[in-house]
Amino acid sequence: MSSPRWQEMHQALTAAGLIVQKSAENRIENLQSVVPLIEAANSSGVRLLNANSVEELLAITSHESEVQSDSVKPNSQTTLPKSENEGPIGRVIAPLQRPHLTPPRPRKPSGFSSEDFPLEASEVDSDIEIHFDITGKSSTEGRISDMQSCFRSRLSQIRDMMLSKGVLPRRPLANSDAWRNRRRHNSKDYEITIVGLASDVKWTRTGSLRFIVEDESSQIMCILKPPNDASPLHASLDGLMDDEIVGVSGWFLTGERDPIFFSRDIHKPPLGNHSKAQAGEEYAVSAAFLSDVHLGSKTFLAPQWAKMIDWFKNDPLARTVKYFVLSGDGVDGVGIYPGQERHLNIKDLFNQYGELARMLEEVPDWVDVVMLPGNHDAVRPAEPQPALDPEVQQDYSNTVFVGNPCDFSLHGVRVLSYHGKSIDDFVATLRSVTYSKPEMAMQAMLERRHLAPSWGGKTPLSPEPEDRLVIPEIPDIFVTGHVHGHFVGDHKGTLMVHSSTWQDQTDFQRMLGFQPKPCILTVVNLHTYASEAIHFA
């Protein structure tokens, strides 16, 4: 079965972690949407779709639709833990019909305070300092020894953070030493702490979290019960990412069965309240953030882009913008997914980059562009990704090309920019994270001090001998993209920006019921940290 519609359906099911057998293909292709099937499979714990399981899941969705109006609020999502915010959470259901595109409305001048955005960018010289970029520094050969070195590096870096910042109640034991003395450490009076990579994370029937903690010496099976006062973000309720670094305090339960480590508490890497650096008053310019332009796609919003260029040239707020950060997927690419060609209006990859260069030439010359790659760009898919090839770069001016992720400073303000592919893994694993709230994934990355912990998930990773996806320094501004949402907010002193897209809703997003938030330019002043979200749609 190879129709374009089936390919899109199959892609959606695969993205949801479902395996489709041949016997179920005809039945699924006849469905109007696979969204109810995916939701029923997730709530039932089903991963293999055959003829029988599909019929059973469809029966569940049919029954739920009959009782929904009497028992459930239309926008509620019962698979997530209850939060303090009683508003609806989860996916935003998008219209089934493709929206009719109308010309963009003329913009009024931005209403902003000159105290928040005090300086024109043309008066200030550029000051971009790159702290880390993988370009030209990748040394992996893809061997098992490289993978082992990468995980040892991750464990060593984050364990040292835990020890230096005092987040552990005592000095941790090596797993081998803890196991050797398990009969001594068999009650709360003899509690110990271990630190390692979490894996094989599962919830038991009683609601406890069962997982393995592995360090350089051995593995130990652990179990964690939700505390009575646990918040929805506590690991016992929210979950753990495979291969994230955790500390665990507790004791061994020994008896007739194999000993298991009873976890009284779990410890995350340190993330205190961060004090942001500020650009000096004489450098009080702004940075603008955008991602996922997807030039070359038929759903690229060209009229709105022209409107943004007009804003850059004429709006008083735009005159404060010194830097324009594009966090990946500047073009839609070629051959990224099956059937992509029919969604493209520029089908040659170099022509896509050439047209993007021409469009960026229209940005005023006082603005410096910082461009990262993403999963649609012409670089290796494995992260960390190097900058775009010099053959592509030669068409651009006033553009600094960096890798993904990139840790850099603008007039002393530390910025961590990451395209955000691993948000897919956070959505698939943690109960608190949804595509409609990408800021929860960003918060989880900061709390774990790692951008993409899970090996073998939805995010391809390069096993560099030193794990360069660890977050060694807390950024002043943390920027992501990828899922076509938008958010600006603070988490423990770090300003989080989830950059908007310049692509309309795609067929794939419509099938998933996801409504993007396109054409929003985020502007942040580097001295005052005042921010403005400029809407162009």
Where are the predicted features?
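Extended recognition/assembly regions associated with phosphoester-bond processing machinery
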Residues: M1-A537
